[in-house]
Amino acid sequence: MSCSSTKNIPEDDQLFVGLTKIEYKDYEKNDHFLAVQEEVEAALATAPNGALFGSSYHRSPFPYGLWIWNAFSKSRSVFSKWMTKSFGKPPVLMSRVNPELRAKVANELLRSNGYFDSNVEYDVITQKNPKKAKIGYTVSLGNLYRIDSLRYVNFPPRADSLIRSSLGETLIHPGDPFKVSVLDAERTRLSNVFRNNGYYYYQPGYASYLADTVSVADTVQLRLQFADSVPDGVRRKWYIGKVNLELRKGFMETLSDSLVHRYFTVRFNGRKPPLRTRVILRDLKLRPRRLYSHDDYLQSASKITGTGLFSFVDFKFTPRDTTLSCDTLDMTLSCVFDKPYDFYVEANMVGKTSGKLGPGAVIGISRRNAFRGGEKLDININGSYEWQTGHNADGSSSEMNSYEYGANVSLELPRLVLPFWRRVRWYNTPSTILKASSSVINRSGYFKRHIVSGELTYNFQRTATSVHQFSPLILQYEYMTHMTEAFGDVMNENPYLLVTMADQFVPKMRYSYTYSSPATYRNPIYWQVVVSEASNLLSLGYLAAGKKWNSKYKQMFKNPYAQFFKIETDFSKTWAVGDHSQLVGHVSAGLIWSYGNSESAPYSEQFYVGGANSIRAFNVRSIGPGAYHTDSERTSYMDQTGDFKLQANLEYRFRLFGNLYGATFLDAGNVWALRDDGYRTNSLFKVKNLLKETALGTGVGLRYDLEFFVLRLDWGVGLHVPYKSGFYNISSFRDGQSLHFAIGYPF
């Protein structure tokens, strides 16, 4: 295969190999210039073959995609077609780059941002190989024109009054740089003001700008003028009339039954509506005899769509009659129900070269509108199974080493079941979740532990980017159903396990806040913080009854209860690197502090690292706390949890071909104890030991994007374990590997 990159370049063309540094002239450096500069460079940017991270300036000396294209694109064999389609990249030709057109686009962009005297020129720079060329751009900006004044002209009196009342919200101010985008935004703002006050038919295009750049040097005097000729309905305020609600189970369904109220009609099929009308009315802000408001329309559409009940939602507004005096819009809301049931499966698989292997799965079904009130009923079962594939571990003669299974039932109500907050305006429909769950943890040859829990949770959202979740009551009970003599010996050797795995109640309260940046952000961020506490209100009751706060052995239903405070946080940021690659950074941390009735937090509440979504070079609970390590198979995976956790991940994701993506990653972290339990040596957190006690792993992976979910395969390789000295201290390459199969991204 020839490695020539110019063998298929047409005689009258050249291969584009990048830009030279763009030269800027005749400008004043300020914030406006820097913002415009970014837009100009985006307009002029063109990635050559083999571009490094999508750069227009730097390229790899090995443009393998172009080489493959040159070698196979002209062949008609099946293999050649597959190679070309999967790996080949056609040459980026100068004729396709079209620098003349790009210079014109950049020049128009400058003028739309106030640089009316700008000029963009280009130069084609032929390389040593005459079939290759770079492009050099020179950008001359000239004076920046600023806003002198803005007048609103020719608007009807009532509309003019609305303009005057909203002048404090105007986006155009004297002295601001001239920007077409701001002018358009101001025109849209006025349109929203009008449409939120009854002017249903008003559109931004019914007003236009006139600009005077001559009267005052380097400034623009603006007039926003209402059009002389517009449809009659545009000048009129409109009120909502009758409301018709159509509920269909399919798009083509003909409705034959109805319920009629004074201003409200529901059309459906059957003896009664498939959905209680109050569920829709609660989210419908447009009401009969009220002025039309576009914000109310948007909020209604968002909330009704957000219930998840419907696959199609459509609003239609129709004038009641055609007379010039008509000011009433009858509204028809058409809703088509989504399929009532959802069936889902989640799966993962972990393999460890030291001998642990096992799958895990969640299988569930959801029922929408379960009781005609918009409720969502969800039932799922889950399980994981792990066995020993090696022959050196204690208990390896057993075919089954451990398994876990459980079930969850939850009911989500589309409202807050609270006596207050009823008039608060939410971004999305809030919800109340009632949940019950049960799980069994079995460690073959050691114990079987049962955890049952119930919770009440409120979800609410005030803005598009922030989600709140508050659980005022979570009641959890953990108890042993079976324990072998061997595990009894382990417990006697390890007082820490004796405390953390004791039978106990865990009455909790929890609050979480989640921030997700808008979808329009090129480099989005995600941040979540979760705060929870256990038994403090219960202990206050004991305190009122005369028992000391720090006294031990207080009970709930004749069983001891746990008492602690816990905080967790999770942060990730994604940087776009080209069109099909990303760099993702992730940090998580957590702390739990036990006090009062507890010496140590329950085992299920403690932190651990390792696994498919953590430090992928190591198995779950196989690292920490601190520099603690045991070679005993009897206690490994049981006591390797901690009170304090730090974890950081860096992952680069890139497209290989089609929907198949590759990844390379670096994971670091550990857990530590905050109290000396007298058993797990070197487990306490100390700042001076932070770096050497941080586990480190790297690896590569594959992701196959099926649009609705992602299949992920990660191969992790250990670099550093906390319990040995030296940087690379893995005993052997074979023992420092883990293979994980999972669904979804790790963060």
Task: Identify what each model region corresponds to.
Residues 540-542, 635-637, 677-695, 725-732, ...:
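Outer-membrane beta-barrel domain signature, especially the mid-to-C-terminal portions
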Residues 262, 266, 270, 350-354, ...:
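C-terminal outer-membrane beta-barrel translocator/porin domains of Gram-negative envelope proteins
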Residues 646-654, 662-664, 668, 695-706, ...:
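Conserved C-terminal beta-signal and adjacent last beta-strands/turns
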Residues 4-306, 315-318, 326-328:
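Interaction-mediating elements
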